[in-house]
């Protein structure tokens, strides 16, 4: 009965529009009262959940991304991507996808990606003769690439939700090939649509232009290498790398790009504080919810329930992916990671599924929810930027949506895509 109260009250509060963090806390409190447990548990678990030192990396990486965003990196990354792939069919659409790959290494956030890259590319694409729906669709789905490129704070969040025992370096490495695969599949999808709609093809600007723009964008791109190599080599921890990323971002944007002004710095501070506040509130509320899940032995019950349905690990993984896709339609990615990890990770381990691989699958699957109504935060940001209705977007986004689902399925059932690089780097 307690489990029913916990999940039903949470679902009911979400359905009537109560924010996720409040829904988590209220449903947990109602369950505690039903069980006769002291309400002080809520305060204790909130303090424990928000007080983990490993989570310090998240606000610092977000801050570094905000600084780079306002310091001129997005324009340089778009210019580089334009020189590399702008001459392909669907030119600016291809530029949008590759720019998202580059920018994901700076921000690690799908919302930041669609805001920065979509905000720059969608108006340009419409002005250059691309249909508005195509411009919005490619920008929205391209933002999924940013979820897995280091320094993805989603991977750090998953590590924390898994108990903090998973290597951040391995998770960062595991996300790279799936991110590249998603990039390639979305580029191919964009190429097919552009060919069908007969969009114009632009001339290749020449290797000298590629080199010039690479040199201009290189200081920003080196941030990814600095973070990944530093953590991988054991030179510094994830938290230390995040602090170094902030200092590096300030040096690049002030001394090299000379674009960051004091007003931009203030905006970066407030933007990072706003985003961090939301994430930390959800983390704190999820800690209470997660404690109750463990207290009520929900993970063990989930293992038994799935074992009664399927014995094969791939069948179980398929069921989990299907559940995550449904959950992603009405739950944002951060709370989904924090709620689903304690439930499904024990199931994955019981069936011999690697926790690193499962983390990539969880984030990639949850990411599809970001472009799916009714919650779909990336979908709504992209349509707002493109000045197009959600209904109009949904009529034509399905080829990109199916392409993203194909990548989810491929990564889920071919573990080597996510596990090869971490193993090769050891």
Model region roles, listed by residue range:
Residues 1-426:
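Alpha-helical transmembrane segments of multi-pass membrane transport proteins
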């Amino acid at each position: 009965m307690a489990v029913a109260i916990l999940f039903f009250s949470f679902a009911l509060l979400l359905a009537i529009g109560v924010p996720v963090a409040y829904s988590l806390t209220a449903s947990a409190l109602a369950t505690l009262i039903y069980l006769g447990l002291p309400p002080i548990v809520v305060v204790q678990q909130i303090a424990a959940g928000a007080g983990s030192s490993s989570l310090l990396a998240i606000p610092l990486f977000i801050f570094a991304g905000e600084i780079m965003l306002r310091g001129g990196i997005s324009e340089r990354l778009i210019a580089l991507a334009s020189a590399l792939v702008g001459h392909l069919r669907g030119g600016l659409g291809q530029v949008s996808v590759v720019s998202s790959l580059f920018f994901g290494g700076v921000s690690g956030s799908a919302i930041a990606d669609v805001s920065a890259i979509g905000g720059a590319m969608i108006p340009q694409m419409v002005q250059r003769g691309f249909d508005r729906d195509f411009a919005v669709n490619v920008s929205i789905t391209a933002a999924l690439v940013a979820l897995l490129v280091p320094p993805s704070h989603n991977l750090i969040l998953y590590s924390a939700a898994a108990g903090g025992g998973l290597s951040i370096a391995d998770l960062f490495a595991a996300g790279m090939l799936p991110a590249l695969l998603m990039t390639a599949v979305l580029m191919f999808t964009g190429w097919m649509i552009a060919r069908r709609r007969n969009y114009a093809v632009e001339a290749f600007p020449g290797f000298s232009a590629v080199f010039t723009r690479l040199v201009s964008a290189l200081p920003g791109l080196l941030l990814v290498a600095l973070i990944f190599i530093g953590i991988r080599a054991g030179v510094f921890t994830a938290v230390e790398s995040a602090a170094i990323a902030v200092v590096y971002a300030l040096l690049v944007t002030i001394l090299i790009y000379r674009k960051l002004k004091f007003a931009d710095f203030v905006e970066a501070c407030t933007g990072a504080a706003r985003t961090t506040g939301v994430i930390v509130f959800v983390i704190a509320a999820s800690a209470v919810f997660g404690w109750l899940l463990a207290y009520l032995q929900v993970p063990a019950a989930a293992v038994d329930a799935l074992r009664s349905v399927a014995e094969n690990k791939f069948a179980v993984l398929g069921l989990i992916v299907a559940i995550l896709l449904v959950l992603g339609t009405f739950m944002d990615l951060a709370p989904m990671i924090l709620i689903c990890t304690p439930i499904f990770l024990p199931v994955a381990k019981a069936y011999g599924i690697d926790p690193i691989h499962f983390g990539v699958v969880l984030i990639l699957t949850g990411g599809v929810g970001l472009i799916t109504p009714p919650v779909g935060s990336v979908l709504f940001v992209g349509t707002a930027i493109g000045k197009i209705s959600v209904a109009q977007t949904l009529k034509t986004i399905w080829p990109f949506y199916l392409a993203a689902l194909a990548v989810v399925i491929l990564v889920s059932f071919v573990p080597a895509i996510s596990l090869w690089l971490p193993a090769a780097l050891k």
